A protein has these predicted regions:
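ATP phosphate-binding glycine-rich loop and adjacent ATP-lid/helix-beta elements
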Residues: 68-99
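Short beta-strand/loop element within the Bergerat-fold HATPase_c
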Residues: 43-53
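Conserved ATP-binding N-box helix of the HATPase_c
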Residues: 21-43
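Short beta-strand element(s) in the Bergerat
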Residues: 20, 52-56, 96
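C-terminal beta-strand of the catalytic ATP-binding
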Residues: 99-106
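Conserved short strand/loop->alpha-helix "switch" segment adjacent to the catalytic nucleotide/phosphoryl-transfer site
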Residues: 6-29
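Glycine-rich G1-box
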Residues: 63-64
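Acidic ATP/Mg2+-coordinating residue in the GHKL
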Residues: 60
C-alpha cells in the first residue's frame, strides 16, 4: 500500500507516561491498520499536540465510513475508556478525520 504519511507533532513523546505512550501506540497502530486495510487512501496525516491532555488527529483521503453507527473503532474506544480518553469521528469521508483525546498519565 503506497500511502504518503505526514506527521506533525509538538509532543515530546519521551515525556509521556508509560501508560500514555502505550495507549497512544496502540491507537496509532489500530488507526494505521484500518487505513491500510479499508480506506483506499493515497495520503494520511497525523497531528499530535497537547491541549489540556493529549490530542491526536488522524486524517486520510480514503473512502471513509459508509454509515457512522457509533460502534466504529470499538477496540480503540474500549482502550481509551481505561485512561479517561475519548474518540470522535469529526468527518466520516473525504477526508475522514478522527480525533482522539486522552488525559496525560491516564488512570490505569
Amino acid at each position: 500500500s503506497d500511502i504518503v504519511l505526514t506527521v506533525d507533532s509538538s509532543l515530546d513523546l519521551d515525556s509521556l507516561s508509560p501508560v500514555s505512550q502505550s495507549t497512544l501506540s496502540m491507537v496509532l497502530r489500530e488507526l494505521a491498520n484500518n487505513v491500510i486495510k479499508h480506506s483506499q487512501a493515497d495520503s494520511c496525516q497525523i497531528r499530535l499536540r497537547r491541549d489540556h491532555g493529549i490530542v491526536l488527529e488522524f486524517e486520510d483521503d480514503g473512502c471513509g465510513f459508509e454509515e457512522v453507527t457509533g460502534q466504529e473503532l470499538h477496540s480503540i474506544r474500549e482502550r481509551l475508556s481505561l485512561v479517561d480518553g475519548d474518540l470522535e469521528i469529526l468527518s466520516q469521508s473525504h477526508p475522514t478525520i478522527i480525533r482522539v483525546y486522552m488525559k496525560e498519565g491516564g488512570k490505569a
